[in-house]
Each structure stands twice: as structure tokens, then as C-alpha cells.
Regions:
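Membrane-embedded and interfacial regions of multi-pass energy-transducing membrane proteins
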Residues: 2-529
């Protein structure tokens, strides 16, 4: 992909810099400002959700500690999950989308800039509403991040209504963000940029946006049904009135399974840009990557009941969902094969983004293998609701989504800030995260297979050693992220000036503009040959 840029197009832009002061951020419609706000917001939520995880791991450091009340422990597990999923991972990827998609497709901005502003500002409101529940008399949500009825309806604390409204706000924000991404990608590509010339990050986000539009209304529906059951006398989820609590699980997981792919597909896209850049050769199998992404997105809609193997669904249903789930391993395997093939015989260097990307490939694959184990319906009776499940989804979410975000941050920080980050500190952040993360989550496979259940504040003595290991690893991983904050601030404030293209093998339009990226870019669209 080569870009020819009209040098004269940038002449008149210098007059239109950002406004000054606080109102610049409150009222901005600039995709770079909004992307920056999403990224900072998601990092703050990452630290908050992480601090909740530290409470969980402190309680589980030894059996019998009782640092916090069991009721509060359950609020921590619930809030940790909700904040990490809806507050950390998803807004981080939306921030990357806002910053990078216009730069990658040669667009002057997002298609719907004012809606962009609104979809961001809904989020602080939503999370203030959610976190405020912790200070209410009956405490915050205590029913797990999957909020199964009747725990979340009949037996819920009074604050559940705030939780429901917070979910509604997040969902509205996600839908608007997704509409914006689709409108931008389908309408604002530079001349010559066909769909099959787009960077894979753009492709994965296009497909993710369709997933969001499809499933966020389902989440809104299920929490609205909860609201009706709690306050308006319906019995959607109450057998006494002719409803069924299992209906909740079906509706929730019909949202929930595509949701986990919403959290990983953008990471697939980012890694598909980063690995070729540091291998100094084009991505292997571009077309198959696009089709694999589409296949994953399609299959994500027909696997939801694998979360429900032990609830009592007909065996023929279990059989279907088992095979459908295993089928997702095929397009995912295509992707892993292509990433490894891209590195094959490349001129590799191991800067921080590449380290995170390689760790992503290896550890995400481990998480995928434990997922295949969980997909086996008869075996799942042993794994279900144990720490093995916790190990599985943290191996896909931490080295998957979170490492994908770290890799992207290090990869694009020079473009955002105009400075190179400190490579030595970046590598240190990587290795501490890598060791801490594996130390925290690998032992969970063992205690899970030995029968330790999830969501408990105390446990049998036989699980003590591995839990202490997990806690030490988790504290190490958590503390390291404060160090990451230091690296980013240091990079913003100074460092070696970044060239327009700081990475040798990087491809794409975003490297044709100066670093830091000007406030307005591609006012005249570039020509893509």
C-alpha cells in the first residue's frame, strides 16, 4: 500500500488547533481528543477494577483470613468483572478505534463526530452510577458479573436498579460507537482504498461493530426484564408466575458470547498490524484473516449454551453447542497459523509492542486450548463453576485483550505523543506483566481441576499453596500497571522525538503523517495505489 500525500493540503490547518481549557475536552468532536479520553477513562477503570481484584486476591491469600466480609467479597467479584469488561477493555478498544481508524483509512474524522462525543460522555455517568452502589445501604451488586436471576432479581440488594440503569447507559454508548465505526469505514475511505486493502484492525472493528449492534439490544432487553420482575410484578424469571430462571441465562448468554468476541477481535486486528511490522514482511494470508474474522463473528451467535451445559438442556442441544463451539477453533487456528507464518523467516526485532504481540499469540492459544476442554459437554460437568473456568477466561482476556491493548499502546504512542517511550522500561513492564500474569492464573487450572469452586471468599486447606502463588502473581501484575502509567506519562512529557514512521516494517496511511499526529489530518484525502 503506498500513499501519495498532497503537501499543500496542510497549509491552512494550523489556525484550527484545539480550544483551550476544560471545555476543549467536554465539547470536542475531534476523533483524536475523543480517542484520548476513551483511553484515559479505560485506564482509570482498569486501575479501579484491578484494585477490586487485589481485594479478591488478598482475601484468598490464605484460608480463613476474613480480611473483608463474605458479602463484600461477592460485591468485589461482581464489580471487578463488570468494570473490567465494560469499563476497561471495551472503552480501550473504542479509544483505539477513534484514534486509528480515520488515520488508517485516510478520513478527516469519524463520520458522526457529535454522536462520538455523546457516546463517550455517557460512560463516566454510567460508571459513577455503578460504583455509587457500593456506598448504598444494602451494598453493591453481589450476584456475579453474569447477574443470574433470581439472585439478581428476587434476592438482589436494593441498588440493583442503579446497576440496571448503568448497563443501559453503557449499552447506548456502545451502540452509538458502533454505528459511528460502521458509518466511518463504509463512507469515508480514501480513494483507492477498497475493503480488501484496509488494515486488519479496521476490518476487525467493522465486524465487531456489527456484533455490538446485534447484541447490545439483547443485553438491554434482559436487564429491562429484570427491572420489570423487580418493580412491576412480571415474572419473566420466576417459576411461580409461569416464568423460568433459565430463560435469563439463554437471553444473557446470547448477548454474552458475542460480547467476548467483541473484546478479542480488535486485539486480533491490532496484532495483525504489529507482527508484520516487526517481522518486516507483509501479513501472511490477509484474505483468509478477513474471512476467519467473519466466520468467528458468525459462529459466536450459535454457541451461547456452552455456558449452560449443567443447567439441564436436552442432550441433542448439548451436542449441537459442543460441536459449534469446537468449530470456532478452526478460524481462530487459521489466525494463529497466519501470525506464526508471518514471523517465519522474517527479520524479527523484539521491541515492546512485538513482545506483547508474541506473548498474545502464545498465551491466547493456551486460553483457547482450555476453552476447547470446556467445550466438551460431558467433561464440563467437572469444570463448570470451578477455578478452571476462571483460569480459562483470564488467559484469553489478560494476555488476549489486555496485552493486545498494551501492544497497541506501545506501537502507536510515538504517533500519539511525538516521543519515543523508554524501551528499557517498556520491556521491564512486559516481563513483569508476563511473569505476574502467568503466576496469577496458571495455578488456577490446577485448583480448578482439583475442585475449587468460583466466587467463594474461603476455601479448603488443600488449595492453600496455589492460591498464595496466585495472589503473589496478581499483586505483582497489579503493581506493574502503575509502572505502565509512569512510562506513558514520561513518554508524553518528553523522550527522543519520534519520526513519522518509527517502526521499520510498519505499513499504512497512519505513518504518512507527522508524529505527533496533527490535530486535523487528511483534510484532502490521500490517494491509495
Amino acid at each position: 500500500m503506498s500513499a501519495v500525500i498532497d503537501d499543500h493540503a496542510h497549509g491552512h490547518e494550523h489556525a484550527h488547533g484545539p480550544a483551550k481549557g476544560l471545555m476543549r475536552w467536554v465539547l470536542t468532536t475531534n476523533h483524536k481528543d475523543i480517542g484520548t479520553m476513551y483511553l484515559w477513562f479505560s485506564f482509570m477503570m482498569f486501575l479501579l477494577g484491578g484494585s477490586f481484584a487485589m481485594v479478591i486476591r488478598a482475601e484468598l491469600f490464605q484460608p480463613g483470613l476474613q480480611i473483608v466480609q463474605p458479602e463484600f467479597f461477592n460485591q468485589m467479584t461482581t464489580m471487578h468483572g463488570l468494570i473490567m469488561v465494560f469499563g476497561a477493555v471495551m472503552p480501550a478498544f473504542v479509544g483505539l478505534a477513534n484514534w486509528m481508524i480515520p488515520l488508517m483509512i485516510g478520513a478527516p474524522d469519524m463520520a458522526l463526530p457529535r454522536m462520538n462525543n455523546f457516546s463517550f460522555w455517557l460512560l463516566p455517568a454510567a460508571f459513577l452510577l455503578l460504583v455509587s452502589t457500593l456506598f448504598s445501604p444494602g451494598g453493591g451488586p453481589n450476584f456475579g458479573w453474569t447477574f443470574y436471576a433470581p439472585l439478581s432479581t428476587t434476592y438482589a440488594p436494593a441498588s440493583v436498579t442503579f446497576f440496571i440503569f448503568a448497563i443501559h447507559l453503557m449499552g447506548i454508548s456502545s451502540i452509538m460507537g458502533a454505528i459511528n465505526v460502521i458509518a466511518t469505514i463504509l463512507n469515508l475511505r480514501a480513494p483507492g482504498m477498497t475493503l480488501m486493502k484496509m488494515p486488519l484492525f479496521v476490518w476487525t472493528w467493522l465486524i465487531t461493530a456489527f456484533l455490538l449492534i446485534a447484541v447490545m439490544p439483547v443485553l438491554a432487553g434482559v436487564v429491562t426484564m429484570m427491572l420489570m420482575d423487580i418493580h412491576f410484578g412480571t415474572s419473566f424469571f420466576s417459576a411461580a408466575g409461569g416464568g423460568d430462571p433459565v430463560l435469563f441465562q439463554h437471553v444473557f448468554w446470547f448477548f454474552g458470547h458475542p460480547e467476548v468476541y467483541i473484546m478479542i477481535l480488535p486485539a486480533f486486528g491490532a496484532v495483525s498490524s504489529i507482527i508484520p511490522a516487526f517481522s518486516r514482511k507483509p501479513l501472511f494470508g490477509y484474505t483468509s484473516m478477513v474471512y476467519a474474522t467473519g466466520a468467528i463473528a458468525f459462529l459466536s451467535f450459535i454457541v451461547w449454551a456452552h455456558h449452560m451445559f449443567v443447567v439441564g438442556i436436552p442432550v441433542v442441544g448439548e451436542l449441537f453447542f459442543m460441536y459449534a463451539t469446537m468449530l470456532i477453533a478452526v478460524p481462530t487456528g487459521v489466525k494463529v497459523f497466519n501470525w506464526v507464518s508471518t514471523m517465519w523467516e522474517g527479520s524479527l526485532t523484539f521491541e515492546t509492542p512485538m513482545l506483547f504481540a508474541i506473548a498474545f499469540v502464545i498465551l491466547f492459544t493456551i486460553g483457547g486450548f482450555s476453552g476447547l476442554m470446556l467445550a466438551i459437554a460431558p467433561a464440563d460437568f467437572q469444570y463448570h463453576d470451578t477455578y478452571f473456568v476462571v483460569a480459562h477466561f483470564h488467559y484469553v482476556l489478560v494476555p488476549g485483550a489486555i496485552f493486545g491493548i498494551f501492544a497497541s499502546a506501545y506501537y502507536w504512542l510515538p504517533k500519539w505523543t511525538g516521543h519515543m517511550y523508554d524501551e528499557t522500561l517498556g520491556k521491564l513492564h512486559f516481563w513483569l506483566s508476563f511473569v505476574g500474569m502467568n503466576m496469577a492464573f496458571f495455578p488456577m487450572h490446577f485448583v480448578g481441576l482439583a475442585g475449587m469452586p468460583r466466587r467463594i471468599p474461603d476455601y479448603n486447606l488443600q488449595f492453600a499453596d496455589f492460591n498464595m502463588m496466585s495472589s503473589i502473581g496478581a499483586f505483582m501484575f497489579g503493581a506493574t500497571q502503575i509502572f505502565f502509567l509512569f512510562i506513558v506519562i514520561k513518554c508524553i512529557r518528553g523522550g527522543a522525538p519520534a519520526p513519522a514512521k518509527p517502526w521499520d516494517g510498519a505499513e499504512g496511511l497512519e505513518w504518512s503523517i507527522p508524529s505527533p499526529a496533527p490535530y486535523h489530518t487528511f483534510q484532502t484525502p490521500p490517494e491509495v495505489k
